[in-house]
């Protein structure tokens, strides 16, 4: 099966329909959309908006790969259920309306997992949310920077075949973890889409893929032979400065990596 190359809406200068059209213009196969919210753009669950975005994507020939609930980093996934559950329900409903296969729930800033209490609350929130996702035929993925033992515990406590972990090729580095090590240790539980970046820095003009300190090549090599093949390599370097040359260079790098992923998968089948 083809390994696609995609973009993340929240790391581009334009948003919404314009971001989808940009993805088509630069030759990306797909795009992950952000749900929006204060300081994050127009909410995708506004009247008619999801349908409009889906129509634009169909017309442009761009796959809608995932929906990310980045506003949870502002609200806090560890907030009381009365606060977080309505947001998770809106995310699941919107993901269904968009027709995406993956819903991303991040655990950074106010959603960071920093102690036993935040871990317990995160597991409870994800367990509640994954029941909604599973009923809709959607995979729910947690993006976090837990070490392997705690990440495995999270998978066990959520306890659903519709739950996965989302691998980022640089975020763990900022927390003293090696993404290639994580890729190997947590191999059975990764979602089939991966965020590619190779900082530092995490924001602003970041190193081109393969030229930074993240060791993105080692991480992708470590994923070879995973039970679940990688279906999408998604760029998450910061392109909000509108520097098209960097975006195109990273797309070309990712395209070569996607070809390698396909060849690796063929090797498993022969």
Curated annotation (Swiss-Prot):
Catalytic activity of the protein: 2-epi-5-epi-valiolone 7-phosphate = 5-epi-valiolone 7-phosphate
Q: Where is the active site?
A: 143 (proton donor/acceptor), 236 (proton donor/acceptor)
Extract one GO molecular function annotation from the record: isomerase activity
SUPFAM superfamilies annotated for this entry?
Xylose isomerase-like
What UniProt keywords are attached to this protein's entry?
Isomerase
Please state the Enzyme Commission number of this protein.
5.1.3.35
| Known role | Involved in the biosynthesis of the alpha-glucosidase inhibitor acarbose. Catalyzes the 2-epimerisation of 2-epi-5-epivaliolone 7-phosphate to yield 5-epi-valiolone 7-phosphate.
**Family statement:** Belongs to the hyi family.
This one is known as: 2-epi-5-epi-valiolone 7-phosphate 2-epimerase
Taxonomic lineage from the root: Bacteria, Bacillati, Actinomycetota, Actinomycetes, Micromonosporales
Record gene name: acbO
């Amino acid at each position: 099966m083809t390994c696609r190359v995609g973009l993340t809406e929240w790391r581009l200068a334009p948003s919404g329909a314009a971001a989808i059209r940009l993805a088509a213009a630069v030759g990306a196969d797909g795009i992950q959309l952000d749900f929006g919210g204060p300081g994050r753009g127009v909410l995708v669950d506004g009247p008619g908006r999801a349908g409009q975005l889906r129509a634009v994507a169909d017309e442009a020939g761009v796959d809608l790969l995932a929906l990310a609930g980045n506003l949870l980093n502002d609200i806090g996934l560890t907030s009381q259920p009365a606060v977080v559950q309505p947001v998770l329900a809106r995310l699941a409903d919107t993901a269904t309306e968009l027709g995406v296969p993956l819903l991303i729930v991040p655990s950074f800033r106010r959603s960071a997992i920093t102690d036993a209490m935040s871990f317990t609350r995160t597991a409870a929130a994800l367990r509640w949310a994954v029941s909604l996702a599973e009923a809709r035929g959607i995979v729910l993925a947690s993006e976090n920077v837990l070490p392997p033992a705690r990440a495995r515990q999270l998978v066990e406590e959520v306890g659903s075949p519709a739950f996965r972990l989302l691998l980022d090729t640089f975020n763990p580095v900022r927390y003293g973890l090696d993404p290639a090590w994580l890729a190997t240790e947590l191999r059975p539980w990764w979602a089939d889409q991966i965020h590619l970046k190779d900082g530092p820095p995490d924001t602003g003009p970041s190193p081109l893929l393969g030229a930074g300190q993240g060791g993105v090549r080692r991480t992708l090599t470590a994923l070879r032979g995973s039970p679940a093949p990688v279906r999408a390599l998604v760029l998450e370097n910061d392109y909000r400065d509108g520097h098209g040359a960097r975006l195109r260079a990273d797309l070309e790098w990712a395209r070569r990596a996607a070809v390698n992923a396909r060849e690796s998968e063929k090797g498993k089948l022969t």
